[in-house]
Each structure stands twice: as structure tokens, then as C-alpha cells.
């Protein structure tokens, strides 16, 4: 009986994997601008809401993937899934760009604006966890009235890329890596949080664990700045020990 159950589980996972691959072949599109090719999937619905979902970071050796496609399957709204497969290892660049040019970020914003116009959406909801959480904040802060649903985000990007050994992403974003560029990246998101003029109209939903390293290194400083600047934000606090466990929440 145990072997049969294991076989069924493997079969289910294989089936889900094949369905995902088939969907990519059918639904994945490409948006090209400023020399950037941005891959995405768009689910249209009769709704005034648009959910924008960003990729998390994969393990070393595994290319970037779309996130939360199955999770949001039954949600009746427009959904834009964006793939961050930039950098030489195709694990992503936080949707920023190469050599400090930020052309990927500009392309992402172009596509979001275009899809918002096409769908007629008047409420934008930016979602992601870990790397995707950083990105959901980075883009969500640019839009008045936006909602940001964020899990375990990094806050000081330069140091995070150094600490996690994500050197390919760092080299892609910075070009020639130096202390000045690392510090610029460290302050990139904090500056946006502090200087944001849309604070009164925005809402942030933040999930994190207070027992894994991202909290002490990043999230407690993010919460400090959100509080000091008067953001409306809600916290969902867990206590798991490993950052990767965020995928279970």
C-alpha cells in the first residue's frame, strides 16, 4: 500500500510538471523593449483587479520559474506573471538591469502599464516572496493606491547578493563590482521607501519569520522604516528557522 501511495504522489507531481510545461508552450509571451526580452504570462478576467506576480530565487543551477501560478488558479482577476530569468545563470537580476542601467526595470514597468491599460484595471496588487517580495515592493511603491503582498523580502540588496553567493546576479546588475555599487544597491529600496510620495494611498501585507536570518539582516529594518514613514502595513509573523520554508506559507 505504501508503495502505491508513493507511486501516486510521483505520478501527481509528474502530471503537474507536464501541465506546467504545456502551459508555458501555450501561454508564455515575450515583451521586447530597450534591448530586453521579458517573458510573461497573462490571465485575463472580467475584473478591475490586476495581480502582478514576480519570481522568487531558485537554487543554484536551476533556472528561474514562474511563481504562484497554481496558487492563484481559482482567483477571478487579471493576473500577470513575470519571469526573471536574466543574468548569465538565468536565475534572475531582481528585474533591475545590467551594468547599473536599470533597463529591465523600465521594461517591466512598461509592460505593467500596458497590461493595466488593456485590462482597464484600477487596482494593482503586487505579489512575491523573497526576491519576488523585494521586487513587489520595488515596483509597487511606484503606483498610487497599490497593494503589496510580500513574503520575507530582502532589503539591502548588495549585501544580500554577497551573503548568499549570488555572484552572477550581482555581476549582471553592477557590471564591475565595487564597494560604491554594493552600497548603492544596499540603499536602492530603502531610498524608495523613505522618499515615496504615495504612502497614504498604499497598503502592504508583510509575511516573515522572526526566527530566520532574513529578519535580523533585513526585515526588521524594513519594518522600522515603514513605521517611521507612516505606511499602513499588516504583519503575518511565523517562527520557522530556514528562509526556504517561506514557500510553505
Language-model region placement:
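The feature captures the conserved acid-bearing segment of alpha/beta-hydrolase catalytic domains
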Residues: 166-236, 243
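Active-site nucleophile loop of the alpha/beta-hydrolase fold
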Residues: 150-161, 210
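Alpha/beta-hydrolase active-site loop
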Residues: 97-118
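Conserved hydrolase catalytic core segment
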Residues: 138-148
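Alpha/beta-hydrolase fold nucleophile elbow
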Residues: 119-130
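Short, surface-exposed "cap/lid" segments of acyl-processing enzymes
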Residues: 11, 24-89
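Glycine-rich nucleophile elbow surrounding the catalytic serine of serine-hydrolase chemistry
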Residues: 128-138
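Catalytic histidine-centered segment of alpha/beta-hydrolase-like enzymes
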Residues: 241-249
Amino acid at each position: 500500500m505504501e508503495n502505491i501511495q508513493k507511486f501516486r504522489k510521483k505520478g501527481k507531481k509528474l502530471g503537474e510538471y507536464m501541465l506546467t510545461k504545456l502551459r508555458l508552450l501555450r501561454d508564455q509571451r515575450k515583451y521586447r523593449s530597450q534591448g530586453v526580452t521579458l517573458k510573461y504570462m497573462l490571465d485575463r478576467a472580467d475584473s478591475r483587479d490586476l495581480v502582478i506576480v514576480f519570481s522568487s530565487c531558485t537554487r543554484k543551477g536551476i533556472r528561474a520559474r514562474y511563481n504562484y501560478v497554481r496558487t492563484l488558479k481559482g482567483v477571478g482577476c487579471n493576473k500577470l506573471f513575470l519571469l526573471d530569468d536574466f543574468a548569465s545563470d538565468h536565475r534572475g537580476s531582481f528585474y533591475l538591469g545590467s551594468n547599473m542601467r536599470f533597463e529591465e526595470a523600465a521594461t517591466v514597468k512598461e509592460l505593467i502599464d500596458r497590461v493595466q491599460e488593456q485590462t482597464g484595471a484600477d487596482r494593482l496588487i503586487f505579489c512575491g516572496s523573497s526576491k519576488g517580495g523585494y521586487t513587489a515592493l520595488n515596483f509597487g511603491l511606484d503606483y498610487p493606491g497599490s497593494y503589496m503582498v510580500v513574503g520575507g523580502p530582502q532589503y539591502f540588496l548588495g549585501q544580500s547578493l554577497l551573503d548568499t553567493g549570488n555572484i552572477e546576479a550581482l555581476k549582471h546588475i553592477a557590471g564591475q563590482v565595487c564597494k560604491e555599487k554594493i552600497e548603492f544597491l544596499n540603499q536602492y529600496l530603502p531610498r524608495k521607501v523613505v522618499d515615496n510620495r504615495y504612502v497614504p494611498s498604499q497598503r502592504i501585507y508583510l509575511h516573515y519569520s522572526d526566527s530566520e536570518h532574513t529578519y535580523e539582516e533585513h526585515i526588521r529594518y524594513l519594518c522600522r522604516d515603514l513605521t517611521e514613514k507612516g505606511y499602513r502595513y499588516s504583519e503575518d509573523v511565523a517562527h520557522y528557522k530556514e528562509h526556504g520554508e517561506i514557500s510553505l506559507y
